[in-house]
Regions:
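Active-site bordering "gate/hinge" segments
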Residues: 1-262, 399-401, 409-411
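Short solvent-exposed loop/turn micro-motifs enriched in small/polar/acidic residues
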Residues: 13, 204-206, 274-277, 311, ...
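Short, glycine-/Ser/Thr-/acidic-enriched flexible segments
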Residues: 35, 104-106, 149, 218, ...
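Short polybasic amphipathic segments
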Residues: 210-213, 281-284, 387-396
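Long, well-ordered mid-to-C-terminal structural blocks that present hydrophobic/aromatic surfaces
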Residues: 254-310
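Active-site lining segments that contact anionic ligands and/or coordinate catalytic metals
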Residues: 260-262, 278-280, 287-290, 313-317, ...
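Dual-mode signal for accessory low-complexity, basic/Gly-rich regions
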Residues: 292-361
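Extended hydrophobic packing segments that form well-structured cores
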Residues: 366-411
Length: 411
């Protein structure tokens, strides 16, 4: 697949028809940067062609975003105007589907005051609570895709002097992860979904009470709440329409018990958070909460993340991804969680998805917390798996059943 236009057309088709699954008469909201415009034009046109009534493009520019972060005061930078909240809520209440196209450099905000970035994250989390609820409970459809910016491509391919070639290489790598390089991408996705669904069914039938992770620098037991549900690729919104939240996706996931996580865990891939890289970090848990942490890179940013709110020091999501997966086998480090989380077992600090608990979407926040489902304004995945990781599922009677051996499925 050498033709640039053909690549973008096929990618747009996968995003619109499989990821977002745009319905006739539906509104579409696209979040993107100016770097992604070549793809955004294609996605916008196709969305209209399949029947979208309105395609709202929320465009930002990385250079301007960096300047705002550098020169605005913390108070100005972290302020979320009411009109922005009202605009998003109006779309949410009218069955909008969100398409997020990631392009920004993982280092975009390197050197910016961590407290300023943390204040924006906290204020945005509180301001967009309705949005978070609609997304976490699948009321609205949403999908996340990506498009390579020059800065991001240079980070992934540091030895490539020609920026255009680096971007082309990254685009080709991205397209492989979302199966656009296949003769029939739709069929390829159907087969992939079925494989992940079978893994989820096995785990649901076992009904483990906890998982025990062991590898170099990791010895962690994560409790699983009563009535938890393992979820594979693919969701349904409130109107019954299918959608695929992450493109790519290789994970099977559920909620962790917010009060039953003990031991220590170390990251195996860098974490890009708030335009900064956090790497070589270790978290120690007791009774579900991070009680100690260290990081060789990005310590202050990690501290801001953990201090976002009470729930940001607890586990919301538990996700299983084999080391023998397409993204992992590519040998590339994307410095982008959307990709790196799909190359590795991972956990998420912060909010759990109510969809991973029986009747969870019908519960209040208080009821979810009583059911040991974590609540937070944040949800940040970090990668912990490698080729040496073993995972045992623990049954109620204490019996241990192999789930992963040497980084891959044991069943």
């Amino acid at each position: 697949m050498n033709n640039f236009e053909e690549k973008l057309n096929k990618y747009a088709e996968v995003i619109v028809k499989i990821g977002a699954n745009v319905q006739k008469g539906q509104k579409v909201w696209i979040n993107c940067t100016t770097d992604a415009l070549p793809l955004v034009y294609k996605v916008t046109e196709l969305a209209y062609q399949v029947g979208a009534s309105d395609v709202h493009v929320k465009l930002t520019d990385d250079k301007l975003s960096r300047l705002h972060a550098e020169y605005q005061s913390k108070e100005v930078y972290s302020h979320i105007p009411q009109w922005a909240i009202d605009e998003r809520n109006d779309y949410l209440d009218n069955n909008v589907v969100f398409i997020h196209i990631l392009s920004s450099s993982p280092n975009l905000f390197a050197g910016i005051d961590a407290e300023k970035l943390g204040a924006l994250t906290k204020n945005a989390g509180e301001a967009y609570k309705h949005y978070r609820t609609c997304i976490m409970t699948d009321i609205n459809s949403w999908t996340i895709a990506s498009y390579p910016s020059a800065d991001w491509a240079k980070l992934v391919f540091p030895d490539e002097e020609n920026t255009d070639i680096a971007q082309e290489k990254l685009l080709d790598a991205i397209l492989k992860t979302v199966r656009v390089d296949k003769a029939d991408p739709v069929k390829a996705w159907e087969e992939h979904r079925q494989n992940l669904t079978e893994k989820a069914e096995f785990l649901n039938n076992k009904n483990f009470v906890a998982l025990h992770y062991t590898s170099k620098d990791t010895d962690l037991t994560v409790g699983l709440p009563k009535n938890h549900i393992w979820v594979a690729a693919g969701c349904k919104n409130a109107k019954g329409a299918d959608f695929l939240p992450n493109m790519p996706t290789e994970e099977v996931f559920t909620a962790g018990d917010r009060d039953r996580v003990d031991g220590y865990v170390s990251n195996k891939k860098p974490l890009s958070y708030q335009g900064n890289i956090i790497d070589n970090f270790k978290l120690t848990f007791k009774d579900g909460k991070v009680v100690d942490f260290e990081a060789e890179q990005g310590y202050e940013i990690l501290k801001q993340l953990l201090d976002t709110d009470e729930g940001s020091r607890r586990i919301g999501e538990v996700a299983l991804v084999p080391n023998d997966s397409p993204i992992s086998n590519s040998g590339l480090l994307y410095y982008q969680t959307l990709f790196d989380e799909n190359a590795s077992n991972h956990l998420a600090l912060g909010a759990a998805y109510p969809t991973t608990l029986k009747d969870g979407t019908k519960m209040t926040e208080e009821e979810l917390e009583k059911a040991h489902i974590n609540q937070s304004i944040s949800h940040v995945d970090f990668m912990i798996g490698d080729a040496e990781m073993d995972i045992d599922g623990i049954l109620e009677d204490g019996t241990k059943i192999p789930v992963f051996r040497k980084g891959n499925w044991a069943f």
